[in-house]
Amino acid sequence: MTTKQVHNFGNNVRFTPAMYAEPADEAGLLKLLEDHNDLSIRVIASGHAWSDAIKTDGLLINVKHFNEVRISPQGDSVYVGAGCQIKCLAAALAEQGKSLPTSGLIDEQTVAGATATGTHGSGKNSLSQYVRSVRVVHFDKETGTPKVSTITGPSVELSAARCSLGLLGVIVEVEMEIRPAYNILEYSARYQTLDQVVALEHEYPLQQFYLMPWSWHWFGQHRKETTQARSKLAGLYRVYWHVGIDWGLHLVIFALVKLMRVKSLIRFFFKRVLPLVVAKNWRVVDSSQKMLTMEHEIFRHIEIEVFVRRSDLKNALEEVKQTIQVFGGEAVSSDLQQQIPKSDHGTYQHHYPICIRRVLADETLVSMTSPSNEKDIQDWYAISLICFEWPSCRHGFFGFANFLASHMATRFHARSHWGKYNPLDRQANQQLYPRLDEFRSVVQKFDPESRFANEWLSNVILSDADRVA
């Protein structure tokens, strides 16, 4: 056990807990909680998040030693340690001809961290939906001593535990649904309108697409499951993607944003250069794990992601575009020009493709894609906006993100990702999550003294009675 300064991947969250510990096993974790039951407790996973969810001035626990993977006798689920990274789980499953039903854009996250914040891919539910049971260490409500509970379902407790934000206790093991390994057919194309891209969703249900800033064209990354064998040129495609996109594109953006810092060059790049260098209509088949992930962890960045319902997608994306334009110094004809404070006009130049992914509604209480209305269950679309500015130069991004999150929540009941930059307060979230009170009741059952909460979570999700002092 030590004390050390901790920071997240984006370097926007820094703090020093009173104590930092990496228990080796469940017995060690129980002893740790028993010995330090006077401290507030949070868990850190991979650190690949941008919200304040991990912050604590008490005990910070890293469960990286909880990494066992074992497939159930029935072969339809896997029991995996909370600290196991998604990429390690995927590799272990692949050896047995198995796969997770979906995958997020990156695979550096841990299983517990990814599920607890509603990490998602495109065209399916979030990872949280596929959680069948959760093993969690918390304090007994009657005796106050640490205990282990296994949460199963169907139950309101499991719906809460699937995406719990770490508020039920320290997750030590998750049981997740698995399926036979599968391949993905992928190709990319450029479009003039949103309708053209969305029209292909039925044929390519796993697709994700991008709105290119400043050119305002659309780029579709069309994907579907296939029984076709891996393409002969799949290896070359992976090299192209790794060298050209994971490294090449991001190095160019790094230079434009962090070194040159000339707005006109950023706009020229997106209008004239990028459309010429992105491979189009190259149809490739490869394993799902290779196709559905990128190496976004190579370059430090910060991200906000908002979720809108299908019925609001078109109007929401138009307002995202106009918000980018106003913050970039352009005039727009809508009322948005007046709604954004004049002091913010021209303060932030967006410089990265806006990624849009469809996510099916989850059977959870507070994941971003939990139903907003039980009588009108719609698909959700995640709209991701990434900034590569130096940490010391992000004031423009924060102004942009703060306005966007608040405006989209008011206009479209848009939710902000719990694991990314999230400025929404408790009042806003109360309106956005109809089952929030049910979630709080489950939290009270497992953590009546709010030992596993922190100031941010108290301010954005817990009730006045549950808040950390």
List the model feature ranges, each with a label.
Residues M1-A469:
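Noncatalytic alpha-helical scaffold of FAD-dependent oxidoreductases
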